[in-house]
Each structure stands twice: as structure tokens, then as C-alpha cells.
Amino acid sequence: MNGTIYLCHSSCDLLNAGTLESYLKKVADWLRDNPYDVVSLLIGNGDFIKVKNFTAPIQSSGLIDHIYTPKNHSIALNDWPTLSEIILSGKRAMVFMDYEANHDEVPYILDEFTYIWETPFSPTDRNFPCDIQRPPGLNEADARKRMYIANHNLNLEISIAGANILVPNTVLLNETNAVSGFGSMGAMAGNCTGTSSLPPTRYSIYLHRLEKWNRPPNLLLVDYYNIGNVNGSVFQVAAKLNNVTYNGKCCGRTTSLASESLIARLSGKLEMIYSMIVINILVMTIL
């Protein structure tokens, strides 16, 4: 509406979470209130909106004061700043975009696939294969030079009015977001890393294929981070990958679906960067 960007999922008729500017203001306020935390935003620009359209809400929200801008746009895997360096710089927000990012036009909105590759998106397979899906055509040698995202948000295909759409598989959330067990986030992280504790089964060949990365995912993307087999299970997995202990209380829900429709994404280990919460803005629509 009047050129304003809204946060929508697939269609604003399905989910409209308000304007981008209002959301980014909440992020900016949170960063000011939490001076030792780091946030990364991954903008899913499914409508292929030109990157310059995002500068106004970023600036008006106040987030611009916190955004990290790299010195160059060919950062090697081990050259990203550490957590302490990010905090001391005061630039504690990293903004990535999957499509239409342009470093020359807006240097602080980072092109996701220049730095990161992803496992299969919107997975429906509980095996959660750790193969390269995006960007298409990326070879293994180049993938080893980049960070990677493990998509661990289990989906279910349903038909509405003759159209097939994917929705979160909420029935299995406790298992999907669990610390361990088949289909769990902990199991996928271990499989990608090459530290799976699952016994030899018919999946042995599959697991052997996954062990080639020999490092944890840099980001773990989940639906409903506040649901799991134990309180804070997704944070426990991320903590384990970072070789630390999670002592927080998270969100209090372990058995029921959150009433709100917020979809948050949680990071895993970032040896060369930091631990962070990733909010994935799925679709940006100008109404």
C-alpha cells in the first residue's frame, strides 16, 4: 500500500504480519536494550523487490545505526569477525537477502548466496538431507568455502481450493525440534557435522554421505523455536554445537503450539562469527 513493504508468507491473504519498518523498529529497540547480543536478519525476498526499496524502512526504524557492513564483499569463511569483535564494534545486526541484493547499491544488505548455501528448502523429508540445494549448481569445493544453513523446519503439503501449499508440520514439532532422536534437530546437526550417534541402520549410506562437511551448520532454521521435547531444546542444540551449555529458560512451551504465528529461525554454530537468532522474513510484498 503506497509502496510500503509488508511481511507476508506466500500471500498477504494467508499471513500479513505488518510492515517491515514496524518490525525492524522492534529489532532496533531490542538491540539497544541488549548491548551484548547480535542479531542476523535473513530477508526472503520472494517478490524480487529491488534492494533500494529496503533502505527507507531500515533507516526509519533506526536499525541502520546497528548494521554491520563488511570491508569487502569477498570474505573468506574464516575471515568473518568474531562475536567479541562484532559486539565491540557496536554494529550488531547483519542483514542478508536471498534475491536482488546488490552490494554496489546497498553495501549493508549482504547477498546470502555469496556467503551461504542452504540444504533443501521447505523440507518434507524427516531424514533432512544435508545436500546443497541453493544456490543451484554450487559445487562441493566452493561450498566448503562458505557458511551453510541447515533447513530444519518440517513441512506438510496440503490442498486448499485446488492449490497445493506447504504448511508447518505442527504435529511432529516436539520430535522435529528435539535435542536427539530420529528427525530431530540434534540428529540433523550431527549428521551434517559427521558426529551422528544414530546406530547403523538402513540410513547408514545416507549418513556416510552427510559426513563430508565435517563442520556444524552455521545456521539452523526452525519453525516455532519455543516448541520442543524439552524447554529450550533448539537452544540446547545450538549451545552444544558451540561447545557451551544452555542455561536459559527460553519460552516455556514444550507440548503445545504457540498461539502466535511468529516464525523464528535459530542459529547453530558460527565459529568465525557469533551465536545469533535469525529472523527469516519469508516474503516481502509491496501493497
Where are the model-predicted features located?
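Cleavable C-terminal sorting propeptides in eukaryotic secreted/cell-surface proteins
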Residues: 260-287
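Catalytic cores of phosphodiester-bond hydrolases, prominently lipid phosphodiesterases
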Residues: 2-257
